[in-house]
């Protein structure tokens, strides 16, 4: 009788183990590239989760030794507002000025500059080194705002 109970208990444990091992992954969201700007050096990304959509920009890094810079923008309404603020700031910014931008608990550093006569921000992600930045041009910002307003993305 004892042997029967042990066999029954082992078979019960073995029948439950496969269920437990397959229950470890749960889809929590998806990320898609919505559109590329500035010949692909800036990508508008959309992350879809249970809490809603979050937009971000992927900026090509100045240094080939570092990963791209990911700039979070927030949900659609917040993203458009932030982009409009960036555009207005670039109109009035002066050489050498820098700004802190905080979104979703992360603080980015924006440094105003000009590259080949084009106004731009050099953007450092949190905890990055001095050569680890991406560029975001005013023209690109305005194109992204137009895209949001025209396509209702």
Predicted regions mapped to residue ranges:
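Positively charged, low-complexity terminal tracts
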Residues: 21-153
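Bacterial Sec-dependent N-terminal signal peptides
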Residues: 1-26
């Amino acid at each position: 009788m004892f042997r029967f109970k042990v066999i029954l208990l082992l078979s019960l444990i073995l029948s439950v183990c496969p269920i437990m091992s397959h229950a470890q992954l749960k889809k929590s969201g998806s990320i898609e590239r919505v559109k590329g700007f500035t010949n692909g050096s800036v990508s508008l990304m959309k992350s879809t989760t249970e809490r809603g959509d979050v937009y971000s920009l992927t900026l090509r890094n100045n240094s080939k030794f570092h990963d791209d810079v990911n700039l979070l923008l927030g949900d659609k309404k917040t993203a458009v507002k932030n982009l409009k603020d960036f555009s207005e700031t670039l109109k009035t910014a002066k050489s050498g000025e820098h700004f802190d931008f905080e979104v979703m608990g992360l603080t980015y550093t924006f440094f105003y500059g000009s590259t080949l006569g084009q106004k731009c921000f050099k953007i450092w992600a949190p905890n990055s080194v001095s050569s680890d930045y991406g560029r975001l041009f005013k023209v690109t910002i305005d194109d992204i705002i137009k895209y949001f307003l025209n396509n209702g993305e």
